[in-house]
Amino acid sequence: MDLADLMEVENGDHSINQKHVQITFFSKDEEIPQIPDAVFDVPTGAECDDMNLLLNKTIEANDGAWKERRFEFLVGETFLRTSLAEFIEEYEVETETILKVECVIGIEAPKPLHDIQAPDWVSSVQIANGHIFSTTYGGDIVIVDRKGKETKLAVNSANRLLKCISIVKAPSKKNQLDGTEFVVGGENQLLTLYAIEKGALVEKLILRGHERAVECVSVNSDSTRAISGSVDTNLKIWNLDASDEATTYEKEEEEESAKKRRKKETKTKVPMVTIGGHRDKVSAVEWCPWNSGHAFSCSWDHTIVEWDLELAGEISRIKGPKSFTSIDLHPKSDLLISSCTDAIPRLYDPKNRDGSMVKQSFIGHQNGWVEAVKWNPLDTNQFVSVSTDKTAKMWDVRSSKSSLFDIHGHDDRILCATWNEGLIATGSADCTIKIFETA
């Protein structure tokens, strides 16, 4: 039975009267069994559901144990989201030869989980150990769990615009909040390391050294070092070990007031190393996944730089078309996804020394620019992007011209995003944090 027959049986469609195109299926996905090397004569009115029907019946005929699954279909670098006829017309696909259709395992769309009201614009967001941590332009630190319950913690950051957060340590006990440590940075040029102890927020370290607002911070995998970037164009490396005296800052003059004496109880540290090299503000920093002595930064000077932190020197530089707003390196594939002050996320291979060559550009956002991109740490193909166009998009790197899913809900531009523990969290200028569950 061919697809025209199947479509007529399943849907009552008179597919036999439609134009036809010849297709063949293939897959690079290890989860998909060997697909018969057959050519199918398919009506151009066929859509994804029809193609799924044909492929599942074909596999089942060769594998009696096969259980029906949902597939996504790629033609070239674009997911099939319409009928074949519409797709062929829109993308001017050549139909004189056999059309090769790639099959990938389908996934469910992200499900809205929680909509959290924040006191101000949301500037950054992270997920760790069953909790979502975010900062705001009003200086607030908002913490909610997977159930949407907020933990109220007093934060001594009134009138201090916060821009970034990075988790330092998460407790070994699942979903526990006590014992969590994180570092935040903002407009007052400082970074502060906090710990949650017995339900209270405790200031553990002050990191002093930047001369202008801190834009970004990232902690390494063993929680011993942090790297930060600033509007002052510099990167600074910090030792997070409170017992380390080499980078401890001691004020020479005697403190006079009791308030100042209390403040002195929080140890202040200066940077281990300062690295200059950017010509404009540093917008994002990330530790290198394959070399703990290296890090990456991006800047409004249109560059992404890989640094040797021990030598405080540049290793390689990627030149982009616009000011970069964010980067993220996948822990498994080592590929780098980036966003700029335009509507296009771009994929680079930083191990390729001709790194300025873009591997892939992803077209889909409208107007404005992409504020942030974040990989799915469990899948080397998937990432999320958020934009000033008020949308988030979930992408598969195998399709550059159509996103997997569009995620709507925000009423103003989206400023930050993260993806971890099966959750996507986005923060916006509409003063909300939206949490979505992914399959």
From Swiss-Prot:
Residues 248-269 are annotated as: Disordered. Gene3D superfamilies: YVTN repeat-like/Quinoprotein amine dehydrogenase (2.130.10.10). InterPro entries: NLE (IPR012972), WD40/YVTN_repeat-like_dom_sf (IPR015943), WD40_repeat_CS (IPR019775), WD40_repeat_dom_sf (IPR036322), WD40_rpt (IPR001680), WDR12/Ytm1 (IPR028599). Belongs to the WD repeat WDR12/YTM1 family. Required for maturation of ribosomal RNAs and formation of the large ribosomal subunit. It holds the Pfam family WD40. The gene is wdr-12. Residues 21-105 are annotated as: Ubiquitin-like (UBL) domain. The keyword rRNA processing applies. GO terms for cellular component: nucleoplasm; PeBoW complex; preribosome, large subunit precursor. This is Ribosome biogenesis protein WDR12 homolog. Its main location: nucleus. HAMAP family: WDR12. Keywords: Nucleus, Repeat, Ribosome biogenesis, rRNA processing, WD repeat. WD repeats lie at residues 117-154, 160-204, 209-248, 277-317, 319-358, 364-405, 409-439. GO terms for molecular function: ribonucleoprotein complex binding. One of its GO terms (biological process) is maturation of 5.8S rRNA from tricistronic rRNA transcript (SSU-rRNA, 5.8S rRNA, LSU-rRNA). It comes from Caenorhabditis elegans.
